[in-house]
Amino acid sequence: MRKIFFDTEFTGLHQNTTLVSIGLVSDEGERFYAELTDYDDTQCDDWITKNVLDHLLLSGNTELEKELEEDELTTRVIGNRDDVRTELLNWLDGFGDDIQFVSDVCHYDMVLLCELIADGAMLLPDYINPFCHDLCQDISMILDISEKAAFDISREQFLTD
């Protein structure tokens, strides 16, 4: 089974949120990074603008642009939802027949990933496990704290403690 770690950025914590970007890293180091051009920017508050949108390639992030240009392991896509879906499925097809996704706080990220790939979990390709391994629950168990406390803890703090 191949593990693929991923994170998404989206327009807010609400029911009709739209995907802004997605990054994935396989357990062997292959990477995929995409920014979507057709997200609903009317859903973005000041926090999303400052902490997400302002750091995108689409916003002129030259530091990220340079980093990605020098990185031969990253597949980079900028496009609409259909473009990103096509390229992501092509990338995932290269991993064989059994993929397990891993994320921090899966209940946000996995829904958006499933919608991107297949318009929902029930339509995922057979080689993709529809269940996501949640790192937040691991943090909760390792530190013997509630999942709420694990959700609130800084990931940088967790890595250094």
Q: What is the meaning of each model-derived region?
A:
Residues 3-7:
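Short, hydrophobic/glycine-enriched beta-strand segments
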